[in-house]
Amino acid sequence: AELGPVYDMPVRDSEQSGWVNALSLFQEDDQRLQDIVAALGKAFLGTENHHLAASGFMIAYLTRVVYPLIAQYVLENRVIDVSLGNLEFHTKGQGFDATALGQPRFAALPDDPDASHSDTEIVPDEAALYARLKEQLFDGNFGLLIPALCRSAKASEKVSWNAVAASCAH
């Protein structure tokens, strides 16, 4: 469902070039990730401090991933697939100007209006949907992202997990 620009997570335009897969970025290209985080720190925060730049990157990332995921869960009873393998970033210079899903996959309850959609994973009940939400956030995303940021961009693990907790509570 379209929930507005802050809460919507569009599907990548397959005709548009310049997309990079999140799994590739966070698991295979430490130097590129370090360069992107450093560029963000300089451009938006006016700093070369690795910790501040990594925190700024984390906040921007959380806004584009957690808000749409939680909004879909609360408002539509859906859990969109935000695993790193399904997330894409559109590059612009040394940064990104868009975040999107590679495929429109989501988990939903049996009575969802789009339950018959080919990209829908039907879960039996609300407890299973909530378990899927936690799996998407932690196993499929932050459990891979935070170690990558710590390794390549010198992020603080504690600060990063605190930012995740704060964004989920927002």
Identify the function of each model-found stretch:
Residues 1-35:
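A eukaryotic "domain-start" boundary segment
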Residues 23-170:
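Hydrophobic, aromatic-lined core segments that form the binding pocket/scaffold
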